[in-house]
C-alpha cells in the first residue's frame, strides 16, 4: 500500500511520517477542495494535485536516503507541514480516527519497508530530473509560506512545488507587457526608428560628451558662464547632433566616463569654484547698478535744489515790453545741452493785445432809476398807467385819460358811462342827430389819432350820450333776428366804457374785486326795489352782473369742453 505513491499523500510531522488518505477518503472526511479558502492564521490552503505531491515527496525521500547513506543529517525542504498550520478544514492529530494511529504505528515499526519504497520512487524522480533538469529542489527558509498555492491548471509535472510570494502569484509565469510598457522600456536607451530617425533619451542629450571623444570641442572648465551669441549656439547644435548620431554603446560609455569624472573631488571643486565665481559676478553687477542709481538720485536732487534752467517771469504789467525766451534741450551722452534762446515777437504782440489777466468780473449794469420799486402790484400798475402825462389837456374830466387815449387808437366809437339795453344791438342807442346836437371835444386839436383814418371824437355825456366819428345806421328787425339765429365771432367797431374799478381790481390773485362785488350785492339785497327778475339791477353793479352772466352762459352752452372735465368749469357767482 505504501508503494502506491500516485494515490497517496504524506506529510512530515516532527520525525514521523503519516500517510494521508486517498481522494475518496478525503471526500468522506469532508476536507474542502475549494481554492481561496482563508484560514484563521492568514494562510491560504489550497488543494495540491496528487501527482505533484507524490513526485515531490518521492524526490525529498530519495535525497534523505542519500544523505543517510553518506552520514549527513536528514533535511527536507519545501515539504508542506499540514500540522503546523492552524486550520479547521484538515484533521487534527488529537481527533484522528483509529486508522491513522494504525498507519502511524506501521510507519514507526517498518522503516525498512519505507526505505525500499524510497529507493523505488527515487528511480521515478531521477527520470523526472533528467526530463526537466532546470526544476530542482531549493531550500525555502521561510516557513510562513510553506504551504503551496498552485492552481489546478498548472498541476502537471512541469511545475515544481515552490513557495509563492504573499501575493499568491506564480513568479515563473510572466505576464505580457502592454504596448505602453514596451514603448517605455524601449525609450530608456537610444534606438533608431524604422524611418531612419535616431532617438536619444533626454538624460543622454543634456549631458555633454567628454573631451576625449570630441577633441575639437572646448572643455567644460573653459566654457564661459555668461550666455553668448551665435557661435556658442552653433557649437551646442553641433554637439547635440553628434550625440544624436552616436550609437547606444558609445553613449553608455560616454555617460560612464562623465559620471566618473563628475564624481571625482577635482571636478566637484572646480564646479564649486565656477558657481562661486558666477554669484560673485552677479553680486558685483548688482552693487555697481545700485551705486549708479544712488549717484543718479543725488544728481536729480541737486538739480531740483539748484535748477539751471531759465524760467520766464510772470507778466505783471503791460507797460514794459515782455520777452519770451524759448530754450530747447537736447540730450547728448546723457547730458542736457541748452540751445540758444529764440525771441518770438508775434507771441509778445498777442499777449499785449490780450491785456492783463486779472480782469474785473462782469457785473450787470446798475438798476435804472425809471424802474419802479413799488412793492404793491396795484400801485405798480397805476405807476405805469400814469407815465404818459403829455396828453392830459385833451382828456375830459375823467381820471384815466391815458386809458381813453388808447381806446381811441383801437376803436372808432367809444361810449362813456352808457349802459346799453342789449349787448347785441349797441349801436341803436346812438344816432346821428344825438351826435350832432351833443357837445363834444375833438381830440385832433392837440394830437390826431395815429391808428384811425378819420379823426375820432371823445364825448362825455350822461348815461344816454355817446361818442361817434361816423353815423351808425339803425339795423332792421330782420338783420337782428338773423344775427341772433346764427352766432359767430366778430370784432365790434364801438366800445362802451363805464367808470368802474381799475384793471388792478380785476386781478384774480387779488380779492379786492370780489370784496367790492359782495359789498354791492349786499347793498342790493338790503334794497329789495333793485331786484328785476333774477338779476340785480343796481346802477353800479348791473353791468358787471350782465357780463358775468353772459360769460357763464357761454361756458355752459357754447364753449367746447371735454365731457370728463365739464364738472370742473368755473362759473361766476
UniProtKB/Swiss-Prot annotation:
Post-translation changes: N-glycosylated.
Start and end residues of each stretch annotated as 10 X 2 AA tandem repeats of N-M: 102-121
Keywords: Glycoprotein, Repeat
GO molecular function: actin binding
Biased amino acid composition, Polar residues: 60-70, 157-170, 226-252
Biased composition (Low complexity): 84-95, 208-225, 441-457, 466-483
Region (Disordered): 1-33, 60-101, 150-174, 192-271, 286-317, 357-379, 441-483
Positions bearing carbohydrate: 63, 123, 236, 437, 442, 498, 535, 541
One example of a Gene Ontology biological process annotation: actin cytoskeleton organization
Domain of life: Eukaryota
Start and stop residues of the Sequence repeats: 102-103, 104-105, 106-107, 108-109, 110-111, 112-113, 114-115, 116-117, 118-119, 120-121
Note: Present with 784 molecules/cell in log phase SD medium.
Family indicated by similarity: To yeast AFR1.
Name of protein: Uncharacterized protein YER158C
Annotated organism of origin: Saccharomyces cerevisiae (strain ATCC 204508 / S288c) (Baker's yeast)
Amino acid at each position: 500500500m505504501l508503494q502506491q505513491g500516485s494515490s497517496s499523500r504524506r506529510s512530515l510531522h516532527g520525525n514521523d511520517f503519516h500517510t494521508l488518505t486517498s481522494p475518496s477518503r478525503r471526500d468522506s472526511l469532508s476536507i474542502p477542495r475549494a481554492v481561496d479558502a482563508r484560514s484563521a492564521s492568514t494562510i491560504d490552503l489550497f488543494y495540491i494535485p496528487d501527482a505533484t505531491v507524490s513526485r515531490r515527496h518521492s524526490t525529498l525521500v530519495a535525497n534523505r536516503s542519500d544523505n543517510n547513506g553518506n552520514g549527513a543529517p536528514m533535511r527536507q525542504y519545501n515539504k508542506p507541514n499540514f500540522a503546523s498550520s492552524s486550520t479547521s478544514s484538515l484533521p487534527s492529530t488529537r481527533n484522528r480516527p483509529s486508522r491513522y494511529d494504525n498507519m502511524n504505528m506501521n510507519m514507526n515499526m517498518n522503516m525498512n519497508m519505507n526505505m525500499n519504497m524510497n529507493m523505488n520512487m527515487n528511480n521515478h524522480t531521477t527520470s523526472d530530473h533528467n526530463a526537466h533538469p532546470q526544476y530542482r529542489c531549493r531550500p525555502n527558509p521561510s516557513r510562513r509560506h510553506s504551504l503551496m498555492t498552485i492552481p489546478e491548471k498548472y498541476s502537471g509535472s512541469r511545475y515544481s512545488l515552490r513557495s509563492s510570494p504573499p501575493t499568491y502569484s506564480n513568479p515563473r509565469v510572466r505576464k505580457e507587457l502592454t504596448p505602453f510598457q514596451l514603448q517605455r522600456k524601449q525609450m530608456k536607451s537610444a534606438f533608431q526608428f524604422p524611418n531612419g530617425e535616431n532617438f536619444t533619451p533626454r538624460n543622454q542629450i543634456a549631458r555633454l560628451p567628454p573631451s576625449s571623444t570630441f577633441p575639437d570641442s572646448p572643455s567644460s572648465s573653459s566654457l564661459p558662464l555668461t550666455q553668448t551669441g551665435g557661435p556658442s549656439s552653433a557649437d551646442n547644435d553641433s554637439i547635440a547632433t553628434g550625440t544624436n548620431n552616436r550609437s547606444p554603446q558609445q553613449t553608455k560609455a560616454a555617460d560612464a566616463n562623465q559620471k566618473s569624472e563628475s564624481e571625482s573631488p577635482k571636478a566637484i571643486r572646480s564646479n564649486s569654484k565656477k558657481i562661486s565665481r558666477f554669484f560673485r559676478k552677479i553680486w558685483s553687477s548688482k552693487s555697481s547698478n545700485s551705486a549708479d542709481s544712488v549717484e543718479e538720485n543725488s544728481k536729480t536732487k541737486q538739480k531740483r535744489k539748484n535748477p539751471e534752467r531759465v524760467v520766464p517771469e510772470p507778466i505783471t504789467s503791460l507797460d514794459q515790453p515782455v520777452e519770451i525766451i524759448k530754450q530747447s534741450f537736447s540730450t547728448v551722452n546723457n547730458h542736457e545741452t541748452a540751445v540758444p534762446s529764440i525771441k518770438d515777437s508775434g507771441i509778445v504782440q498777442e499777449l499785449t493785445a490780450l491785456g492783463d489777466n486779472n480782469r474785473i468780473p462782469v457785473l450787470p449794469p446798475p438798476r435804472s432809476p425809471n424802474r419802479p420799486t413799488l412793492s404793491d402790484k396795484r400801485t405798480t400798475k397805476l405807476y405805469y398807467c400814469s407815465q404818459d402825462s403829455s396828453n392830459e389837456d385833451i382828456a375830459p374830466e375823467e381820471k384815466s385819460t391815458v386809458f381813453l387815449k388808447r381806446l381811441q387808437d383801437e376803436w372808432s366809437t367809444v361810449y362813456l358811462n352808457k349802459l346799453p339795453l342789449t349787448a347785441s344791438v349797441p349801436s341803436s342807442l346812438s344816432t346821428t342827430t344825438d351826435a350832432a346836437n351833443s357837445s363834444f371835444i375833438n381830440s385832433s386839436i392837440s394830437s390826431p389819432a395815429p391808428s384811425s383814418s378819420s379823426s375820432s371824437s371823445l364825448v362825455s355825456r350822461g348815461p344816454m350820450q355817446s361818442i361817434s366819428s361816423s353815423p351808425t345806421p339803425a339795423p332792421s328787425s330782420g338783420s337782428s333776428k338773423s344775427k341772433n339765429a346764427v352766432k359767430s365771432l366778430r370784432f365790434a367797431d364801438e366800445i362802451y366804457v363805464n367808470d368802474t374799478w381799475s384793471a388792478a381790481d380785476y386781478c384774480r390773485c387779488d380779492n379786492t374785486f370780489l370784496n367790492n362785488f359782495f359789498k354791492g350785492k349786499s347793498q342790493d339785497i338790503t334794497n329789495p326795489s333793485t331786484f328785476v327778475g333774477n338779476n340785480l339791477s343796481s346802477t353800479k353793479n348791473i353791468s358787471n352782473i350782465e357780463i358775468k352772466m353772459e360769460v357763464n352762459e357761454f361756458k355752459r352752452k357754447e364753449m367746447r369742453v371735454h365731457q370728463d372735465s365739464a364738472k370742473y368749469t368755473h362759473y361766476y357767482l
